[in-house]
Amino acid sequence: MQSSLKKSLYLGLAALSFAGVAAVSTTASAKSYATAGAYSTLKTDAATRNVEATGTNALYTKPGTVKGAKVVASKATMAKLASSKKSADYFRAYGVKTTNRGSVYYRVVTMDGKYRGYVYGGKSDTAFAGGIKSAETTTKADMPARTTGFYLTDTSKNTLWTAPKYTQYKASKVSLYGVAKDTKFTVDQAATKTREGSLYYHVTATNGSGISGWIYAGKGFSTTATGTQVLGGLSTDKSVTATNDNSVKIVYRTTDGTQVGSNTWVTSTDGTKAGSKVSDKAADQTALEAYINANKPSGYTVTNPNAADATYGNTVYATVSQAATSKVALKVSGTPVTTALTTADANDKVAANDTTANGSSVAGSTVYAAGTKLAQLTTDLTGEKGQVVTLTAIDTDLEDATFTGTTTYYSDLGKAYHYTYTYNKDSAASSNASTQFGSNVTGTLTATLVMGKSTATANGTTWFN
């Protein structure tokens, strides 16, 4: 009897001990999770709540330290979104929760709606930190030299947006009801998509309809181009439907007859007829040839537009060749100029001067270039593959340019110096007598040693090796 009682007591105590351990374990497990406070909707201006991932935290279905939180986008995925070159991968923050541990989690969604969830945002519900940071989805761009007299290139295809697509959450198309092919627009803002770099103009219709919005503007308006300019969805001439009476088909083909592209040029001149020569109106002839050159297939250059005898309703066969683009390899000619320095400073230049001796290279990644004709340089560095470059055009683009080195050097006495450069046209001529498009053009520079730190930011990789 006693033995049976003892055994029952032991079993009872064991059961109680197990239950106690289970209770402690459950309590400890519960304490390992945070609890989230009430959800709050963010009410500040929506554009100020555009953010981008930093790649340091994952995205969850609920605050990440709360029980039941599941991963929506891993830390690795968020890192990819952080380094993305697509505006669609920005986020919009629209809500917030704070845990009992003081951690703030923002409710966010990507601009394309693909990812939505909570991401750790630091310890403040008024500033973005942790897994996200504020983002400027667009960057202000220079206004075009011409702001009036634009038309939609094709009213059936081109449209306006409330914001450049994916730069604001739920950016949408603008209704074009009331817009005709001859509706004029005025440009009142210009911006680029920060990640893609693509240019957009904000335009407003001048017909009193109040219609306005953003539209892709291609390379933007050019002050040097002749004839009609097509800027993405905008044109400097009204939209006209192509017919035999007002258009010329252009076929681009190589010297062996291989077709590599085609296009259609349409005149905005009234009264033209099928079979009549385009050259009957000098302005139209100029516009046609400019169009042929401007709309050539990618990777080709026009060697002969063959447009002299073009007639409306017929085809022009423009001859093209493979194009090649050179870059300029900058080199120092002679010893650096030090005349602007005091005698004491000139004697202290040795440590800095060692890096820029006669014949040394100047990388495009270490120089800031400025000049009124640099925009033309890419065009002048592109030509028919195998042909000798036209150095006179390149000289013209570079001779008024100034170059500032971005590197700061220190002398033996600890003084700061940097270099500025000017283009040496005469030395360049002797170095490029037989340089062909696609090969580096040697650009010789005269270097000047300047006292003080460099504050310039490199921009030279577009044109210079």
UniProtKB/Swiss-Prot annotation:
How does the record describe the protein's post-translational processing?
Glycosylated.
Determine the domain of life of the protein's source: Bacteria
**Is Nucleotide-binding given among the entry's keywords?**
no
| Cleaved signal peptide residues | 1-30
GO cellular component assignments: extracellular region; S-layer
- UniProtKB keywords: Cell wall, Glycoprotein, S-layer, Secreted, Signal
According to its UniProt record, where is this protein mainly located? secreted
Subcellular location, in the record's words? Secreted, Cell wall, S-layer
Task of the protein: S-layer protein. The S-layer is a paracrystalline mono-layered assembly of proteins which coats the surface of bacteria.
Name of the protein described by the UniProt record: S-layer protein
Q: Which organism is it from?
A: Levilactobacillus brevis (Lactobacillus brevis)
